[in-house]
Every structure is written in C-alpha cells, then in structure tokens.
C-alpha cells in the first residue's frame, strides 16, 4: 500500500486506544485532536481520554459483563485499562479512577510513543481513500458531524447525556454521613448521606419543580437510560429514585450513627452516595445524580442532601448531545464501513455506550485498521466474548429500533447444553468460556 501511516481522528478513549493498538503493531499513526485549538463546553482539559461524565469504569467482577470486557481488554494490552489500573481510587466492587492522573498518564504515553504523531487540529471532512479511524465521540464538531450525518443518510440519531456534580470533601458535614459500600462489598468506599422519609419527600418536591437549563436544540429530549438526569428520573414517579441511585438496601446505619432517622429502622428511607473522584480523596461525585438543572438550582436543591448543606461544588452537572450512527446499516463487525473498507469508526458514535465499551471499540478498530493496512483479512472476535458480542450486536440489531447499548450478558452467545439456573454460576460459566475462546482466538 502507498499509504505510509494510518489516520486516527479524535483522542478520546476510543481514539487513544486505536492509536496505541496501531502503533504497537509497528504502523505510524497521525493522531488528530482538536482540543488545544478548539474546545468543547464539556471537556475541562486538553488531555487525551478525558472522562467527561463519571470517573467509574463500573463493576470489576467477572460475573459482571463489563468486568469480563475489561479482563479481555487487559489481555489485549489495552492502554486505557493499563493506565486505569495504575490510577485506581477506592470504589468498593467497582473500578474508579483518579480522572486527572489517569488522562494525564494516557496523554504522556501517547505523546512519547515514537510512531504516534499528535496533531492538534480540527478535521472538518471525512478523508477520502486513506485508512482512517474516526473516533471523535459524542461531542464531534459541527462541521465533521454534518459529514457523518450525510454518511448516515441524513437521519438524526441522538440522545442527551448528563454528568453529575462534584463536591469538595472538606465542605461535607462528616457527622451526618457514614462510610460504607453496599452490602459491605469490597472496602468501605462510599460516603452515604441518609434521608428520612420526610427529608426525601421534601427533596423530591424540590427536584421535580427545579428549573432546568434550556436545550440548545428544538429536538425532542431523548435520554440514554444509563445516564438519565436525576430530575427526569424523579418526574417518573415518587419512588423511582428509591429503586435507582437513592436505593437504601444494603446501606444500613452504622451502630454509632447519631443523625436523624425514622424511628428504630436500621436502614434509611433513602440514601445519596458520594464516590471518591481523585486519588487524593479531596473530591467526591454524587453517584447517579447527572443533571441538567441550572447551576443555581443545583446548589439549592442538592444542598438539601444531609451532609451537603454547606458543600462547595467544584463542578456542576452538565448535559450534552450525543450523536450516534446507523451502525446496523453502515458498519461491519470490524468497525469498518460497508461502503469504504478503509474507513473505520469507533467509540460512542457507533452506538456502544460507556467508557469501557468505547475503548473496546477503538481496540478492535485499531487492530483491523492495521490488518487492512497490511493487506490482511480483518478479524471478527468470537461472539462468545464480550469484545466480540458488542460489535456483533450494534451491526446486526434492527436498525429501526437501534439505540446505544452497554455490554451485557444478554448479547453474548448463549452457553450450549442445559441452561444453568443459578445466575451467578451461569455468568461465571460464560466468563470462563469467553476467556478460553479469546485465548484460542489470539493463539490461532
């Protein structure tokens, strides 16, 4: 091939992973990132793989589909997983990272790689025949988004995403909260703000009547269920939050708790959890409280949470518009487009949802871009693995009803033989098979 390098556009999680996977296989990369030249309202730095929403990579157990996906990615030498592990912060049974330290480490490793040339510039058009991975994410610039929109057949696929507020730990009233992980799983990693029924009812009323920031679009509000604004959830019903982010089960009061409670109940009526957001432990995010309320309203309403009456918000919640492609009609399982095998897409724009899933798509796209570059046949990971099931789902589901998807055991190929009734045992069996099949696939 006359082309001497591969283009990667976008240095988020998917683009950073794709660039690394290409370079580690000996192919030069030109990595384009517009931040540094043109910023977005949601990004706070110019670093690569910045985590805009939560700092959590979610569950770490192999009986959790995202835990399996992460383990598969570790075995494929994922730059995102490796640096995530190096910058972990306590989060019970989940994997959370110091977002600044982690993204700085990814940025440094990319910059130091001898085969990766970083170009700070905005790309406004889709390259012609050059082998290219586009991983510009949900915050793609308007000009490039318009070109992708044309590729999409003019159809608008989108939903709205929101991020949760972050507070300064030193401004939390520690006497009103307690340290505990749900069901005491893992280390006690969350600060829990318990509410009585009276406190919850007042909070729910304030939340459902608070003023929201206006959307910069005439389009209908559509949300991805995994990142729904807390005020939207609250409006679905008085108890919706009690089965979601404010679920109290497994978060019993400690014996020495002296704050307000409903009679002699051992468990609060509702609980708001705070999760450590940086390695120093000075910042905590409000778990599941992504929001689109006006900033003044966020301060007023969220300071009703016990322990946060005088909390200082170092970042308020924000919302942004996520666009995604008609992947069932446009993409192959390799993340190459059906019409142009030299053009690959990766990340949330393909319809995978979540940090880990985005990085995984970049990993697969990067590997296949190299194979295309070398004139080799592209690879499709086994559908028995999480990293193979995800691209299979987004490219084979019904286009009319296509929406972004997190990895889950439901999209992984079913086990052969009699169904295992116990869910944990079934998931363990799926994970064991996945890792064996991945090993066979890599050694083939």
Swiss-Prot record:
SUPFAM superfamilies: FAD/NAD(P)-binding domain
Keywords, sorted A to Z: Cytoplasm, FAD, Flavoprotein, Methyltransferase, NAD, NADP, Transferase, tRNA processing
Binding-site list for FAD: 10-15
PROSITE patterns hit by this protein: GIDA_2
Required cofactor names: FAD
Enzyme class, first EC level, given as a word: transferase
Localization in the cell: Cytoplasm
Keyword Endoplasmic reticulum: no
The protein's name: Methylenetetrahydrofolate--tRNA-(uracil-5-)-methyltransferase TrmFO
Organism: Streptococcus agalactiae serotype V (strain ATCC BAA-611 / 2603 V/R)
Gene: trmFO
């Amino acid at each position: 091939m006359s082309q001497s390098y591969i283009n990667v556009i976008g240095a988020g999680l998917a683009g950073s992973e794709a660039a690394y996977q290409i370079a580690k296989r000996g192919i030069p990369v030109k990595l384009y990132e517009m931040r540094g030249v043109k910023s977005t309202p949601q990004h706070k730095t110019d670093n690569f793989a910045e985590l805009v929403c939560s700092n959590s990579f979610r569950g770490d157990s192999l009986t959790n589909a995202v835990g399996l996906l992460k383990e598969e990615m570790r075995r494929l030498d994922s730059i995102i997983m490796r640096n995530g592990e190096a910058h972990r912060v306590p989060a019970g049974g989940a994997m959370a990272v110091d977002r600044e330290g982690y993204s700085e480490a990814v940025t440094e490793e990319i910059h130091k790689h001898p085969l990766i040339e970083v170009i700070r510039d905005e790309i406004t058009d889709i390259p012609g025949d050059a082998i290219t991975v586009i991983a510009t994410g949900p915050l793609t610039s308007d000009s490039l988004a318009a070109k992708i929109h044309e590729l999409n057949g003019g159809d608008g696929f989108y939903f709205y995403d929101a991020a949760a507020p972050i507070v300064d730990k030193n401004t939390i009233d520690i006497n009103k909260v307690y340290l505990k992980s749900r069901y005491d799983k893992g280390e006690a990693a969350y600060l829990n703000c318990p509410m009585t029924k009276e406190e919850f009812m007042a909070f729910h009323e304030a939340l459902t009547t608070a003023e929201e920031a206006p959307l910069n679009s005439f389009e209908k509000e559509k949300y991805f269920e995994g990142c729904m604004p807390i005020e939207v959830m609250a409006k679905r019903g008085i108890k919706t939050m009690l089965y979601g982010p404010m679920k109290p089960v497994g978060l019993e009061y400690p014996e020495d708790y002296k704050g307000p409670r409903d009679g002699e109940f051992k468990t609060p009526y509702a609980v708001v959890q705070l999760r450590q957001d940086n390695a120093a432990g000075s910042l905590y995010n409000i778990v599941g409280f992504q929001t689109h309320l006006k900033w003044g309203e966020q301060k007023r309403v969220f300071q009703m949470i016990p322990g946060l009456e005088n909390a200082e918000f170092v970042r308020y919640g924000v919302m942004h518009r996520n666009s995604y492609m008609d992947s069932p009609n446009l993409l192959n399982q390799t993340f190459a487009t059906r019409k142009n095998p030299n053009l690959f897409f990766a990340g949330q724009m393909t319809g995978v949802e979540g940090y880990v899933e985005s990085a995984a798509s970049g990993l697969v796209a990067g590997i296949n871009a190299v194979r295309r570059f070398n004139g080799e046949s592209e690879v499709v990971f086994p559908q028995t693995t999480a990293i193979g099931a995800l691209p299979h789902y987004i490219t084979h589901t019904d286009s009319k009803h296509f929406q972004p998807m997190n990895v889950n055991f439901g999209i992984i190929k079913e086990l052969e033989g009699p169904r295992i009734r116990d869910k944990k045992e079934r998931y363990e069996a799926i994970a064991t098979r996945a890792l064996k099949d991945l090993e066979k696939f890599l050694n083939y």
